[in-house]
Design a protein with these regions (language model features):
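Nucleotide and nucleotide-moiety/phosphate-recognizing core
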Residues: 2-161, 166-185, 190-195, 199-200
Length: 201
């Protein structure tokens, strides 16, 4: 049975945040503290340890007491670059990933994903959510993967492909449905930040 002791959490804070004017999203003030702190507090009980993937503000992120890992690929290559460096430094059998700007991430994220992965002998599972209109949306940056997938990912990246869904298709993978779509709400614009703050006010 997969438990929290078998899982390392990886918080992705390495993006450009172009729609936020290029500011570092993880450090945006949110209810009196940096946005990443909400992700840390929700992820921490679900994992044995945490890694942070960031490409700037390294000193500030290091103040949280967790290893801060920079991409080893150039030019902000997206979440797969973060996955790659996270897998390289993961010392547990599984890696659970989450973006830094989703302060409502599910508190049962690891539990539900571990059950799906283990029960169906999968290599990777990712979240999906049901929206108010009934549509199912993929949430691929929220995923649980075996930590022995580094060679597979590096081989994929060596082809110059950065599309997360295409890598998933090369694996034994599946999605896990979460009914609360708001749990995956993230911050891409100032308006979305304001809306999220109102949810928690």
């Amino acid at each position: 049975m997969i438990t929290s002791e078998h899982i390392t959490g990886l918080i992705l804070a390495g993006g450009r945040a172009q729609r936020m004017g290029g500011i570092d999203k993880g450090l945006i003030p949110f209810h009196g503290k940096a946005l990443i702190e909400s992700a840390i507090s929700r992820l921490k009980p679900q994992v044995s340890t945490i890694l942070i993937n960031a490409n700037r503000s390294i000193t500030k992120y290091s103040h949280y007491g967790y290893p801060v890992l920079m991409d080893e690929t150039p030019d902000f290559s997206g979440p797969l670059a973060g996955f790659s460096v996270g897998l390289k430094h993961c010392k547990t059998p599984y890696l659970l990933t989450s973006p830094c700007d989703s302060p409502l991430l599910p508190t049962d994220l690891a539990e539900k994903m571990a059950s799906e992965l283990e029960g169906n002998h999968l290599e990777l599972v990712f979240a999906s959510s049901k929206e108010n209109d009934g549509k199912i949306w993929s949430q691929p940056v929220f995923c649980l993967m075996r930590s022995d997938l580094q060679d597979s990912l590096n081989s994929f990246l060596s082809k110059g492909d950065l599309k997360i869904d295409r890598w998933f298709k090369e694996l034994r993978s599946s999605s896990v449905l979460f009914e609360n779509s708001q749990a995956f709400a993230n911050v891409n614009t100032p308006e979305e930040l304001s809306a999220l703050e109102k949810v928690l006010s």
